[in-house]
Curated annotation (Swiss-Prot):
PANTHER family with a match to the protein in the record: PYRUVATE, PHOSPHATE DIKINASE REGULATORY PROTEIN 1, CHLOROPLASTIC (PTHR31756:SF3)
HAMAP family referenced in this protein's UniProt entry, alphabetically: PDRP
Family statement: Belongs to the pyruvate, phosphate/water dikinase regulatory protein family. PDRP subfamily.
Domain of life: Bacteria
Catalytic activity: N(tele)-phospho-L-histidyl/L-threonyl-[pyruvate, phosphate dikinase] + ADP = N(tele)-phospho-L-histidyl/O-phospho-L-threonyl-[pyruvate, phosphate dikinase] + AMP + H(+); N(tele)-phospho-L-histidyl/O-phospho-L-threonyl-[pyruvate, phosphate dikinase] + phosphate + H(+) = N(tele)-phospho-L-histidyl/L-threonyl-[pyruvate, phosphate dikinase] + diphosphate
Positions that bind ADP: G147, L148, S149, R150, T151, S152, K153, T154
Keyword tRNA-binding attached: no
Lineage, broadest ranks: Bacteria, Bacillati, Bacillota, Clostridia, Eubacteriales
Name of the protein in question: Putative pyruvate, phosphate dikinase regulatory protein
Pfam families assigned: Kinase-PPPase
InterPro entries linked: Kinase-pyrophosphorylase, PPDK_reg
EC class (word): transferase
Keywords in alphabetical order: Kinase, Nucleotide-binding, Serine/threonine-protein kinase, Transferase
């Protein structure tokens, strides 16, 4: 039986997945052994006696660090063991095309996976706590958005979620008030979305026209009603002492950028 050693200087997930994909092309039974965290030349020396015991073997390596990768390759050549460096040649080719040196970061793929799953978690969070569905997420939120109806709270929450930021949004309505819990969280997390009265009237009227709502919803887009709501939202935001952002004629991306900078968000990957 053939044994394939999936060796890496991280958790060996990439090497393991590549090996599984290749092994699936054959009917014969193939044993796969994952060998993670081979970070030094000494680590290579430690695993070699065990590898040498196996009669039929191949090594699949995703080791990033050059000296460790080259040492492993040299040992394999000396022992007449077939080795495939999965990432090395590709890194070298891309480095040549870009005319720049790679960072050689072990576990970089795992970091990208973590960023991806953080985004998914943030999106689920945003949907769960959208528009006052549940205030239980306040203490776990990275950002709390407050504002009147039609101030882009939901799309802004989803945009932030795509950056891995957990955002909860709370609508401001004079008849309902805000949850008491909001006064217990760090005000630096809270962002009040303000808007010009004339633009809000226009947005709400278009909303009503879209759904052909007239009689029971006239107040929703009425001048007096909107001015009352704006005064109420101003009072709440002042009481909370939170940062306010005027979203009038402002793109969601611009509003999000202000928030991300305020909470110290760092873009930590160059993968898009």
């Amino acid at each position: 039986m053939l044994t394939i050693f999936a060796i890496s200087d991280s958790i060996a997930e990439t090497a393991h997945q590549v090996t599984l994909a290749v092994a699936a092309q054959f009917k014969e039974k193939i044993k796969i052994r994952r060998v993670p965290y081979i970070k030094t030349i000494d680590d290579v020396d430690c695993i070699f006696p065990e590898i040498a015991k196996i009669e039929r073997k191949i090594i699949i390596s995703t080791i990033i660090t050059v000296d460790v990768r080259e040492y492993l390759t040299k040992k394999c050549y000396e022992k007449n063991i077939y080795i495939m460096n999965v990432l090395g040649p590709l890194i070298d080719s891309i480095s040549s095309m870009l005319n720049t040196n790679p960072e050689y970061k072990p576990g970089a793929m795992r970091q990208i996976d973590e960023i991806y799953y953080k985004r998914i978690e943030a999106m689920e969070f945003a949907m769960q706590y959208d528009d006052s569905k549940d205030y239980g997420g306040l203490k776990n939120a990275d950002v709390v958005l407050i504002g009147l109806s039609r101030t882009s709270k939901t799309p802004l929450s989803m945009y932030l979620a795509n950056k891995g930021v957990k955002a909860i949004n709370i609508p401001l309505m004079p008849e309902i008030g805000v949850p008491d819990e909001i006064y217990t969280i760090d005000k630096k997390k809270i962002f009040g979305l303000k808007i010009d009265a004339f633009q809000l009237i226009e947005i709400r009227k278009k909303r009503l026209d879209k759904f052909h709502r007239i009689s029971s919803s006239i107040e929703y887009a009425g001048d007096e009603r909107i001015l009352e709501e704006l005064e109420y939202s101003d009072r709440i935001m002042k009481r909370l002492g939170c940062k306010t952002i005027d979203i009038t004629q402002r793109a969601i991306e611009d509003t999000a950028l202000i928030i991300l900078e305020s909470i110290g968000y760092n873009k930590n990957t160059n993968i898009y």
